[in-house]
């Protein structure tokens, strides 16, 4: 790719702008003259006769995969002399077998065995190895199958016989919005009631009149309540006496004692103080249980809890040392361990418990 000079336009200042305008106008005139008027539409030509179309299909170059007959089966247009739309009504022998459209006619000099066999002059078997779709090789007659469909190469498993619905969604089933019918606003038949008609049919009272009535009613109620509250002194005293009697009755009821509780009691005499009488309730198990629990409790000193666990062993000073003079010196038996019971700390010792001193 050729490189452009970015500084090429810097030297264009010397040109006359009027000359540039004239040059542009000339270019526009030439372009208008070059435009040609549209040609008249051509009428369709007469189609060629069937015999000529068959000859042209024979002389045409051979196709791609299938050779003379397409992939070894019925020719679909890929091979030489495939299905031709112009030869639908021709006199080819293929129409005698009931197939619509012209199929490739086998060449006269070709051998049927080398082409995999033919049925009624038409290729049914495919490939070099033998016939296809139930055809019989070596020119023997057999049942002829229908021609393949246009979409025969696509797998039809999992597809129903129904037509596809236009639209998106899974499996071309459309979207949820398609099933919802469009809502059309229907004119309402209800007639709005005018406020004037309501006033005529109802009461003619205004809100001011209602307020006045309510004020009068309130005044009457207050007067009746005031009359009910008024009473004489005697009536007031009677009310107070009734209240006092009710209070005294409740107090007396509270002070009453049930004698049923003392039926299981028995009067005994105390040996020490004969003047005092003691009542002991018989058949009470709670006191017996308390006495048993108190007897079970023993007075234990704190020293017993402060002692270490029984059987605990410890090493005294120098227990792990060998001594100074070897085996025969002072350190004889330096490795012996003494099992001693640890003494409990003395509570009175201020060194161990300085806060208690």
Curated annotation (Swiss-Prot):
Q: Which GO terms describe its cellular component?
A: nucleus; perinuclear region of cytoplasm; plasma membrane; plastid
UniProt family annotation: Belongs to the SERBP1-HABP4 family.
**SMART domains from the xrefs?**
HABP4_PAI-RBP1
Q: Which domain of life is it from?
A: Eukaryota
Protein name in the entry: RGG repeats nuclear RNA binding protein C
Signal sequence span per UniProt? none
Cross-referenced Pfam families: HABP4_PAI-RBP1, Stm1_N
What InterPro entries does UniProt report for this protein, alphabetically?
HABP4/SERBP1-like (IPR039764), HABP4_PAIRBP1-bd (IPR006861), STM1-like_N (IPR019084)
Give every FF domain span. Answer: 239-299
Alphabetical UniProt keywords: Acetylation, Cytoplasm, Nucleus, Phosphoprotein, RNA-binding, Translation regulation
**What function does this protein fulfil?**
Ribosome-binding protein that acts as a regulator of mRNA translation by promoting ribosome inactivation. Binds RNA.
Molecular functions (GO terms) = mRNA binding
- The protein's gene is named RGGC
Q: Which residues carry this modification: Phosphoserine?
A: 355
Q: Which residues carry this modification: N-acetylalanine?
A: 2
